[in-house]
């Protein structure tokens, strides 16, 4: 039994690390879902969006043993919930393999702060779709005037007052790291679970993206 346990633990760990580079995770066995530290918000499509970085989903067999467990990255769409019966091969969660999203947990009107064309942001147009996005520039490449600017997306209510994160006195504002991609319009409306910005995987790997996000204590 000792050898078996070691092998299984290793296998689960391997599966979790492989899943991180994929665009989702599937159950290997039939069983019942058990969630570990999974915190979600429900988006406008009625999907559960993970807003923790430490959440995991396990699959329990009929004897109550956890047969497998997977890390669920921040921003993933969680397709199952605690107590659900799942089949072998069923998809448990999915995410964008190429970018890390910044998710809003608060609804409101967004306002861009320190967004300056050609200084803190560069505008790019997709050749195929024609959709224009803004990319946050690296402070190292900015002139002296832009070095101290910190692009932020802040949230306000219908009366133009800043909204706070739920249960806190902290204004809801999301600091954007270099290379973050923004597809929203200034003064547009966002709902809970919407993507505020996306950070390309390669730039996210090179720095701790939680440093640019609020609510770190909750994650």
Regions found by a protein language model. Give the residues of each.
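Intrinsically disordered, low-complexity regulatory segments
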Residues: 1-219
